Amino acid sequence: MQKSNLYSKLLKSPDDAPVFISEKLELDFISHAYSLGLFPWTSNPVTWWCPSPRMVLFPDEIHIQKSIKKALKTYEIRLDYDFALLIKHCSLRKKTWINQEFIETYTKLFEQNLAHSVEVYENDEFIGGLYGLIIGKVFFGESMISLKKDASKIALIKLCEILKPYDFLIDCQVPNEHLKFMGAKEMIKKDFLKILEKKVSLESGFENFQNLL
């Protein structure tokens, strides 16, 4: 089935319920699923979602609080430095469905240069960050963590800064006030899938994410 036909089918999928369920994460299927607008939300079994509205962020629309501007100059940002450490910390949060299968699968995606991380350090100590997948000109955000106040915000601001020249879209998945305050907006499924279909078909514009700093 052509991709455009799959997008049409997803337009009719549930807005606030899983599109389908799978017993496990299939490595070869994941990037295809993301490019169609699907993402996994739970494990055992894995539920795949394409909600509406969708939360998205255009890098040039990021809001930077005055209180964070100083921290941006204080903390060190590293890209793809210790993906395993970041995803491990994300899995240790009280409310998370990130299990060992998820960690192993996304670590393999990192090794395949599909998953990427933005990490924040203070005095060489990890204090937070975020990770997601890059397909075409879309960064599909998966999870973020702050071990120190505003660390995840700093990671997101830095992500926007480095992706802005490449005309990227950041998929933030489901709406929340934290991201809305930072400039993210809600987009209905029809509009999201339309821009997604175009963006994932383009080249990212860079060869190595780690070298964007």
UniProtKB/Swiss-Prot annotation:
Swiss-Prot/TrEMBL keywords: Acyltransferase, Cytoplasm, Transferase
Reactions that this protein is recorded to catalyse: N-terminal L-lysyl-[protein] + L-leucyl-tRNA(Leu) = N-terminal L-leucyl-L-lysyl-[protein] + tRNA(Leu) + H(+); N-terminal L-arginyl-[protein] + L-leucyl-tRNA(Leu) = N-terminal L-leucyl-L-arginyl-[protein] + tRNA(Leu) + H(+); L-phenylalanyl-tRNA(Phe) + an N-terminal L-alpha-aminoacyl-[protein] = an N-terminal L-phenylalanyl-L-alpha-aminoacyl-[protein] + tRNA(Phe)
Gene Ontology MF term list: leucyl-tRNA--protein transferase activity
Enzyme Commission code(s) on record: 2.3.2.6
Record keyword Cytoplasm present: yes
Enzyme class: transferase
Signal sequence residues: none
UniProt GO cellular component terms: cytoplasm
Superkingdom as given in the UniProt entry: Bacteria
Pfam families named in the record: Leu_Phe_trans
Functional description taken from the UniProt entry: Functions in the N-end rule pathway of protein degradation where it conjugates Leu, Phe and, less efficiently, Met from aminoacyl-tRNAs to the N-termini of proteins containing an N-terminal arginine or lysine.
Similarity remark: Belongs to the L/F-transferase family.
Stated name of the protein: Leucyl/phenylalanyl-tRNA--protein transferase
Upper lineage: Bacteria, Pseudomonadati, Campylobacterota, Epsilonproteobacteria, Campylobacterales
